[in-house]
Every structure is written in structure tokens, then in C-alpha cells.
Amino acid sequence: TRIKAVLVDDKNQPIASGAHEWENRYENGVWTYSLEDIWTGIQDCYQDMAKDVKAKYDVELESVGAFGVSAMMHGYMPFNKEGELLVPFRTWRNNITGEASEKLMELFNYNIPQRWSIAHLYQAILNGEEHVKDIDYIATLEAYVHWKLTGKRVLGIGDAAGMFPIDTTKADYNQEMVDKFDELVAPYGFSWKLRDIMPKALVAGEDAGVLTEEGAKLLDVTGKLKAGIPMCPPEGDAGTGMVATNSVAVRTGNVSAGTS
């Protein structure tokens, strides 16, 4: 699998790119990537693209008009108030939430696949995992990266729908189901309610923040990249694939044969 960075011009034509090879690990019965894997991969990928820009155009890459982050959907990255990851990233590839998935399907009368973030959260609760009481934020991979680059806890609606069911009339999490979940876990006495710990769902074009000074240094280890670049809502690979193949118009569709 590769992490990819693509620079496009004002006509949406690719003009430079970079890549980094990475592979998930199977540790303690869980498919995962470490935070180090994530950031060394992103940084290496960005540098590869910056070198391509320098080689092709003899220009140092210092800013772009706008950018966004896309990554694998679903999964589970719970953080505490200090921003520390409480358990290793549980990716979409894990099938370890069968009990939670079944019970939530019954509760919501709605299909909840095992890979969805809400299934991971409820399974951790059913397992009696210590970390759940300390959760301050739950993210998917791109929600996490976007948060670190902008400070904003937001997620594009395509992958928000891979965390929890969406009310399509409101373009937001289904409030009736949110209430049912909060009621379901109330006996455990957690300090949080579900909406407190989930990223805000955004639709395309909404303000998702700008690259911060801290985020710029995280992305470009050489320090050349400038802060202040607007960022679009981060999205899952399915929605990104549809946009990239122009399959967003009515009566069009796309078939993914692997996301990379």
C-alpha cells in the first residue's frame, strides 16, 4: 500500500507527485499502524513530492492554494484529553466487533458493519476496556491527521457515515440513534456523551480550518511550508475515489478494485 501526495494545477491536472510504501502490522490480534508509521510515511511522501516540484520546475514548495487529506475509512483511534492515543489504531480490516455489531443493529434497526467506529467503541465497552472512561476524542485516520494539521475535530460526511449512521436530511449523525446509544451506555457512568467525542460532520465546501504553524512543521520537516493554507473536510477513500473518477453526478457510479 502507498501513501500518495498529488499536486494539481488550476485546471485540476496533476503536475507533481510523491509516494511512500507502507504496510499494516498484525499485533496482539489487531491489524494496526503505529503513529510513527503514519507520520514518517506522510513526511516522506510530502518530501518526495516537494523534490519532484524542485526537479521539474526549479521551485521550492512553500505554499499551495488549498489541500485535503484522504485515508482509509472506519476504524478506531481513541484519544484522551492530553491528545494521547489510548490503544493502538484499530483499522477497518479488523473483524473483532461481532457482538457489538449485532447488538447495535438490533438497537438501531440499521446495518452496523464490524469496521464502523461505533462498533469498535461499543465492543471496547462490552470488553470492559479501561481506556473507554478516558476518551476525549475518537477519530478515523484522516480525521486524526486533519486534527493534527489544523486543530479542528471535523470529518467529511462520507467517512462520518463510516463512523456512525447519518441522517441524510440533515447531513449529520442520526440524532435518534445518538440518543439511543447514549441511553444504552448510561449505566456505565462515563463522563462523555457520544457527540462530545465524535468529529463534527461536514459536507464538501464547508470550512474545515487552515494549516497551523504546528501542522506545517509536522507535514514539512524542512520547515519551508507556510501555515495558513485552507483545508477541505478530510474524507474517506470511497468518497475521494468518486470525486477523482468524476462519479458524483446523478446516474454515474464507480467500482473500486482496491483503494490504492
Residue ranges and their predicted role:
Residues 32, 44-260:
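Glycine-rich phosphate-binding/catalytic subdomain of phosphoryl-transfer
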Residues 37, 41:
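Charged catalytic carboxylate motif
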Residues 1-36, 84-91:
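Short glycine-rich, Thr/Ser-proximal phosphate-binding strand/loop in the N-terminal lobe
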